[in-house]
């Protein structure tokens, strides 16, 4: 199997699914002749042509609106929003149209639109190129939200998203776009949406993470093996695999949640609520959230803002000593 990074895995997934199903169409800013700002669509314009790899104006609302129309007419569009920070001009189209079409039509019109967008920090992009808006779209309802941490999951989950009948927000973590590498199956390959993965087994505490922060949490756990932490890669944020989370927390009695979005009203708050509802009598300590600060994403202080391995390690050591 080839050794690929996440960008290469995404590119291959798109190529395989476009060959498999001629209804799959790509659209977005600079995705065609240029191959995308991160080169995730490189070569696809030459292979499939301008009618299936479509360069669009810089108008996010228009990109998503066009994708919705394509889906209603039987296509399977995969629009790219160049950075997740720029997804907000399309908020109305995503939340009020895309996420509600199946409900509004009484199930007559599914909208299989997969929105790809790079997410999070890691490139010193400041507050215009580093945000993590997953909680907003999970809250909106009607959308599946996926955030892989590695190339294998990126390919398998993207293929499943494209083949599904639901709208999906597919978040690609920039910090590990090229840094995370692994052997990726060639040809058709899928991973079911909605299934978390136990990355590291343990009995001392449960650590939940996704995207780029999975790697930081993994490093923190490896540096402190006596914590005996069980690390879970959520992979799919919504629908959340709450059963896998529940099983782990009931076993360990302690839970830490790691994400790079701001702490207040971040997705970790919802996970914490679900965990305490299901595991209250099994908890030996309050649930811990290790997250970005409640500030705009800084440029110079990026590494102080992100919950990197040293801060995670410090938090986990404190969690071990916590009592109800």
Regions from the PLM with identified roles:
Residues 1-167, 171, 176, 303, ...:
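Thiamine diphosphate
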